[in-house]
Amino acid sequence: STADCLRKLRLAFALVPMLSLMCDNAPVFEGKPREHQLVRTDIWQHVDNDRCGLVPDVLDPSFDLRRYAEYILDTVAILIPCQQQRWCYSDRTFGDIYAARTMTRAEVEHAVSMFFTDVRLKTYIEIRPADAMPIPYVIAYAALIKGLFYAPTSLDAMDGLFADVRRDDYLAAQDALMESGYEAEVFGRPVAELCDRIVKIARDGLADEEQGFLEPLADLVARRVTLADLAERSERA
C-alpha cells in the first residue's frame, strides 16, 4: 500500500547514518589513508546535491508520493532517449520534457534511475548506504534488512525509535559519525546504543534459523569497530 511504502521509505532513511557506520569498509581514499570515518558518505556529499543524499522533506510526517514525484519531475534529466542516438544530453527537467503527455513506464523507470539518493524508491525500496564488504558481511546486511523491514514488530519498534528524526538531525548525524564514529551522538543519544537497538530489533524480526546470518555485523557492533577500523589496525575481523 502507499502508506506501507511511505512508512518503510522514511524508516530506511532514518537508518542510513547507522547503516553507514555499521558497514564502513573504506580505510583508504585515492591511494591514501582515510582522514575520517565513513568515506563513502563524504564522497556522496560531494556529488550532485540535486539528485543524491536525502530526498527533500522525506522525513517530514506529511511527505507523500506526490511530493516524491514532484521531486523527480522538477530535476534536470541529464540523459533522455532520443532518435539520433540511444541517449542525448538534456538540461531540461523531466517535468518540462514530458509536460504534454503521460510518461511511459520505461520513461518513469529511467527518470527514477537518474537519482542516487541514500535510499531510492523504484518498484522496491533500495537501501544504499553499505560499503562493499566480504561475503559474510553482505549476507549479514541482507539479514539485518530482512529483520528490520519484514516483521511488523520491527517496523513498530523503529517507528518509536525514529519518530522525531528530521532533516537537520539526519545531516548532523552524518557529520558526527564521519568525525567520531562509534563515539558520536546521533539523534540525541550515543550511536553505539542506537546500533545495539537496531541489531536487537533485527534479530527479533528473524526466524531462529536465520539469526546466525546476522552475527558478523552484530559482532562488529558489539565491539564498537568497523571493517575499516580493523583494516587500519591490520586486524582480522
PLM ranges: what are they?
Residues 128-214:
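Substrate-recognition/cap regions that form aromatic- and gly/pro-loop-enriched pockets
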Residues 122-124:
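Active-site lining segments that contact anionic ligands and/or coordinate catalytic metals
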Residues 39-51, 172-180, 225-236:
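Short, charged low-complexity intrinsically disordered segments located at boundaries
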Residues 1-120:
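Loop-rich catalytic cores of soluble enzymes, especially ATP-dependent carboxylate-amine ligases
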Residues 110, 126-128:
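Beta-strand-rich recognition/accessory modules
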Residues 29-42, 68, 162-168, 215-225:
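A glycine-rich phosphate-binding loop feature that marks nucleotide/adenosyl-phosphate handling sites
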Residues 202-237:
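C-terminal amphipathic alpha-helical interaction region
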